[in-house]
Amino acid sequence: LDQLKQMPDSTFNFDDVNLEYFKDVYVMLGHNYELFNGFSLMTGLAMHWRYTAYRNSEVEGRVRTRYNGFAPRIRVSWTPKMHYYMNGNRKVNIGSRCPTFVVDYEHGLNVLNNSGSYQRLEMSAEQVINIRKIHSLAYHVGGGFFTKQKEMYFVDFVDFANRNLPQGWNDDIGGTFQMLDGRWYNSSRHYIRGNMTYETPFLLLYPVSKLLSFIQKERVYGGVLFMPHLNPYLEFGYGIGTHLFDFGV
């Protein structure tokens, strides 16, 4: 880690360093319950079993060959003024004009062999704003950090992951970073990020809309990420949505 911190941002390249030292087996158990309208509480347990990917005398001389993790987890999600309807005895949420706020906390405990302690905290807010019924602006902002790490040198964020998409967005392209190397997601103890998508049926293709009637929506994407060696990282894109698929560049 000290060697990585000393590398200038302009010269840092993951392909120049070998970080594939460990394999990870991960299990997450959880239960989610809505305490009252719009306020959900998830409690769970996260467990990791990490071991060296291959025999390396340089690595084995500095760190252990096995690291285990045992961490109780709690996640709170609150959407003020949530609208809903009842389908029999089942409550169905249909959305709100207010943002959704999320706090996710995990506390690693030193209870297993070769385990260590740590704390992870992530916070975020996201919303889809409808504009005159046919346009929409969706945004997601958030940040997180690891702290009090003792004999545990891995960072595994939950909200900041290339597999994680915001809830309720109309496509699977916005809300995340499409071009970011996946190794960045677990390369820093802290991050701040923001993503937005503007969606409208009329934008660049409006003059030829009659010829391209199968296109339902046009979208403009933007994203910014702050973390060590990426200050900042920016992404911009354009996409279309049809009955069958979404496409973006």
Give a label for each model feature:
Residues 2-133, 219-221:
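Transmembrane beta-strand segments of outer-membrane beta-barrel domains in Gram-negative
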Residues 2-19, 89-94, 98-206:
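C-terminal outer-membrane beta-barrel translocator/porin domains of Gram-negative envelope proteins
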Residues 3-8, 15, 56-59, 139-141, ...:
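Extended interaction regions within the primary functional domain
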Residues 29, 43, 68, 141, ...:
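Feature targets compositionally biased, intrinsically disordered low-complexity regions
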Residues 34-38, 81-83, 130-134, 201-205, ...:
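Outer-membrane beta-barrel channels and translocator barrels
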Residues 58-59, 153-154, 224-225:
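Short alpha-helix boundary/capping motifs
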Residues 136, 197, 201-209, 213-242:
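Outer-membrane beta-barrel transmembrane domain signature
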